[in-house]
Curated annotation (Swiss-Prot):
The cytoplasmic domain may be involved in the regulation of trafficking and proteolytic processing. Regulation of the proteolytic processing involves initial intracellular domain dimerization. ERBB receptor binding is elicited entirely by the EGF-like domain. It comes from Mus musculus. The lineage of its organism: Eukaryota, Metazoa, Chordata, Craniata, Vertebrata. GO terms for biological process: ERBB4-ERBB4 signaling pathway. Residues 1-62 are extracellular. Residues 84-115 are cytoplasmic. Signal peptide: none annotated. This is Pro-neuregulin-4, membrane-bound isoform. Keywords: Cell membrane, Disulfide bond, EGF-like domain, Glycoprotein, Growth factor, Membrane, Secreted, Transmembrane, Transmembrane helix. The keyword Transmembrane helix applies. It comes from the Eukaryota.
C-alpha cells in the first residue's frame, strides 16, 4: 500500500517492476522502487526469495521424527536379540555344568561301589 509520499508509477515506469511487483515513485526521489509480491525480492523484484533453511519446515521435522523412530526401534530390536542370544548361551553353559556335575556324581558313586 502506498504511503502519503508514494505515488504509483506513470506509464514511463509501468514495466519497471518484475514478477508482479508494484511500481511506486516518491516525488523527491528520481528513480522508482518496487513493492514485491510474496516470494520475490530485490530492487525490481527480480530475485526469488527462498525461505531460510535454518528454520526447519514441518515436513523436515516429520522426516526427522520418522528416522529417529526407526533408529530407536532397530536399536531396541538389536538389544533384545543380543540379550536373548546371550541368555541362550548362558543357559547352555549352565546345562553343561549340570551335566558335568551329574557325570562326576555318577562316577563318584560308581567308584564308591567298586571299593
Amino acid at each position: 500500500m502506498p504511503t502519503d509520499h508514494e505515488q504509483p508509477c506513470g506509464p514511463r515506469h509501468r514495466s519497471f517492476c518484475l514478477n508482479g511487483g508494484i511500481c511506486y515513485v516518491i516525488p523527491t526521489i528520481p528513480s522508482p522502487f518496487c513493492r514485491c509480491i510474496e516470494n520475490y525480492t530485490g530492487a525490481r523484484c527480480e530475485e526469488v526469495f527462498l525461505p531460510s533453511s535454518s528454520i526447519p519446515s514441518e515436513s523436515n521435522l516429520s522426516a526427522a521424527f520418522v528416522v529417529l523412530a526407526v533408529l530407536l526401534t532397530l536399536t531396541i530390536a538389536a538389544l533384545c536379540f543380543l540379550c536373548r542370544k546371550g541368555h541362550l548361551q548362558r543357559a547352555s553353559s549352565v546345562q553343561c555344568e549340570i551335566s558335568l556335575v551329574e557325570t562326576n556324581n555318577t562316577r563318584t558313586r560308581h567308584s564308591h561301589r567298586e571299593h
